[in-house]
Amino acid sequence: MELYELKNIIGNNKIALYGIGTETERFLKENGKKLSIVGLLDGFKSDGEIYGYPIIPISEIPAKGVKFIIVIARPGSCKAIAKRIGDFCRGNDIALFDVRGRNLLDVTAVAYDFRNISGGSRKELIKMAAEAEVISFDLFDTLVMRKVMSYTDVFDILDCQLRDKGIIIPDFAKHRLFAEKNLSKEKPPRLEQIYEAVLSSAGGAFFSAEELAEQEWQLDFSLLSVRESVKDVFDSFVSMGKRIVITTDTYYSKQQITEILDKFGFHGYDDLLVSCEYGTAKTQELFSILSDKFSGKRILHIGDDEFADIEKSGSHGIDAFRIYSAAALFDALGGLGVEDEISNISDRVKIGLFLERIFNDPFLFEDEDQRLSVKDASDIGYLFCGPMISDFTLWMNDSIERQGYDQVLFGARDGYLIEKLFQMLRTSTSHYYFHTSRTAAIRAGMESQDDIDYVDSMKFFGSPEETLKVRFGIDVNDINSIDRNSAILEKGKQQGKNYHKYIDKLGIGGGDLAFFDFVAKGTTQMYLQRLFSQHMKGFYFLQLEPEFMADKDLDIEAFYADEGKDSSAIFDNYYILETILTAPYPQMEEMDDDGNPIYVKETRSDRDLRVFDRAQCGIMEYFEEYLRILAESARKENKKLDEKFLALVNKVKILDEDFLTLKVEDPFFGRMTDIKDVIG
């Protein structure tokens, strides 16, 4: 949008400009006299003067009669600014636009397809590249990306790491960003220069600038991943014999950028233009340097930033092609409805892991139906189940340690994966994968008519003979040919003895026990408790119908309480988690005379088991990355965010046909449900 168009929107109203960088200086030189500018706003400074205008706090804007705020920043930064001051603007009836005329108070509707996204296709990129003699690539968010929501999240993660070492720099992340922005007004700084400014403004020398810079570099380097489809394009251009240049705005040295490129196998490029080495950015004269180096050659630049990569390269006579960053795709889909739940760095890391996985490929919108999709069960585990299962595992571990339990039983088969995650925490709590099932516990726990009546109160979808066989392990052709209750109680005595043999082999200590079950009323725990002399407390993901067990004297604490079912989305989607949390062997039905588990006949195919394994590997990969990236002190539970991630399994297109053939099994009740019906 040209200024005159923006001026038509503003009219003669008083305005404030947000931003005090060099682009603001340029804007004021060209347009300052044409507009009624009251002052400048900034995220760090709220007083002083610059470019002949006062810097004022946003709280004073309404009293000064300002009706418009114009944000002068890159599109990606505009969004962050709008989030920061949007509510203030709405509450004070102040319009908020960027310098390109975009209304920053407009809310993008949530979508699960790319129909409203217009972008160049891979085919168009290849055509443009064929006509170019030199091809320049941006680096960050184009060839590589970070496993965080924004590069500034690196500062918050580093702050957590420093605090865990006893190094506290108040407002560290704010100082770090301000130093970078302030120094960049003159020319792109090196990371060491940024930290010299940080230490100066923070008023201390906890580390040297070099040490802090090295720690940030190592952290950032560990957060990077390659955008595989863009690398494929890069490699194809190298194979075509094109001259390739990497043109990047960065505070890292040329040697460090080379390390990044080497890590991900980027070879065959001819030159590397690093802004802080040349003392000029892409928004300044870096593209002039590129043009001069290849004078007379037709150059194509490929990057993600609308302003720095596309507009600025074009202003230097360079052709440009935009590659969508993961953040841009996320924004274009209205943040998929999850963005409102973000409140801390833990949430931002979760979002970052999600974006890095689902939007790694910038050409997603080229698919025929343009729906957001996932290709494999491992993605389902990682993207949709990983956040919820991670928060639950951390909650359970914290609860067990805080309450003084030093041993925990992970009941089969739900506990198969959870125990693996528990091991990754390297906790001192002794843990045992405990072979059991609702059926096995019931068979070993039958001691009275009341027990039989309790089990019979739970409806079974089958004949009386089938009920007796499936639930109690007694096989007869005619239920009337035996004394049913006596047979059940006798079976219970024998199974109790067999189970004690199994327990003795485990070598469980004499202290109180924590017991894991995933989604349950408490039946399994109730009957297992009879096999142990010590107290047992259940730690469940979700307890169903707790009022049904109120008179059973059970000690149970649940991650999700039943009373919250009306306000929580988990009750619509936990079946998906329950299906994936299984083991690679059938349900156990009882113990043999030597205390070894006996299993029912496997009903799942090898293909089904491979699907479960892939989904569980995805969850484990997510958990491992989350633990690696975020210090323990910064990990925060957020069920609402987790629920929204999980609910997305109903919104995206699942391309793994093997996953879609799975069935949700419940042998105890004689029920089988297609997974397609569960995920709607």
Q: Model-predicted segments: where are they?
A:
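Short glycine-rich phosphate-binding loop at a beta-alpha junction
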Residues: 15-17, 68-70, 136, 245, ...
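Hydrophobic, well-ordered beta-alpha structural blocks that scaffold small-molecule cofactor pockets
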Residues: 1-107, 492-495
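Short, polar loop motifs at secondary-structure junctions
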Residues: 41-47, 305-307, 543-545
